[in-house]
């Protein structure tokens, strides 16, 4: 991922602070699209804490000039909007969105799962698979690669579709989200509910 050798971090004479500076310099000077799998909920949090405790700017990868694609979120879209990606059905009868399961379902060798090197190789192969099989989802993910891009897309698009991380039906067919700083209010229609059953309903009926 970076040209920094792991052995130099373990056995080298640099401090943790120096390591944080080196990582910060690398990410600052290499403004590429960053891919991760569940990185929003895990990796970026760990990195922010690491930067903070070493006196570095913790939100380096959250600025408006950075693009981050979380392939777990792309997997939600692949599950709901495409038949091109294979999924393992778990014990609950639902499609498994674990990185290892997605890889195995699509013929990708995961090596030794949950080790840094093999997990990174698996991530790269899943990214290649998604780019080949569902390019429209990957390019849309890049278009929505940070919160500023998402807000712009939600304002500019007449219809904005997104996939929920959960697969169960929402309790209400219509949800209003007022996002601070946006010019308009966003209404989300849950398409798990048949729109014909409520599209002409009154506000009182919908609120039930």
Regions inferred by a protein language model and the residue ranges of each:
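Short glycine-rich, polar/acidic loop-and-turn segments at beta strand-coil junctions
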Residues: 13, 38-40, 192
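Acidic catalytic cores of enzymes that act on phosphate-bearing nucleotides/polynucleotides
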Residues: 143-207
């Amino acid at each position: 991922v970076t040209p920094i050798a792991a052995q130099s971090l373990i056995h080298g004479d640099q401090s943790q602070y120096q390591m944080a500076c080196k990582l910060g310099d690398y990410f600052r000077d290499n403004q590429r699209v960053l891919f991760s799998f569940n990185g929003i909920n895990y990796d970026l949090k760990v990195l922010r804490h690491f930067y903070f405790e070493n006196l570095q700017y913790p939100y380096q990868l959250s600025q408006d000039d950075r693009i981050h694609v979380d392939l777990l979120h792309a997997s939600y879209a692949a599950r709901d909007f495409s038949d091109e990606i294979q999924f393992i059905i778990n014990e609950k009868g639902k499609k498994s969105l674990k990185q290892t399961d997605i890889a195995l379902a699509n013929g990708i060798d995961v090596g030794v799962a949950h080790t840094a090197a093999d997990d990174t190789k698996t991530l790269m192969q899943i990214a290649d698979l998604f780019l080949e099989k569902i390019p429209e989802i990957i390019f849309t993910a890049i278009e929505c690669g940070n919160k500023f891009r998402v807000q712009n897309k939600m304002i500019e698009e007449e219809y904005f579709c997104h996939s929920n991380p959960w697969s169960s039906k929402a309790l209400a067919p219509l949800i209003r989200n007022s996002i601070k700083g946006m010019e308009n209010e966003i209404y989300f229609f849950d398409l798990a509910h048949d729109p014909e059953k409520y599209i002409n309903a009154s506000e009182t009926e919908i609120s039930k």
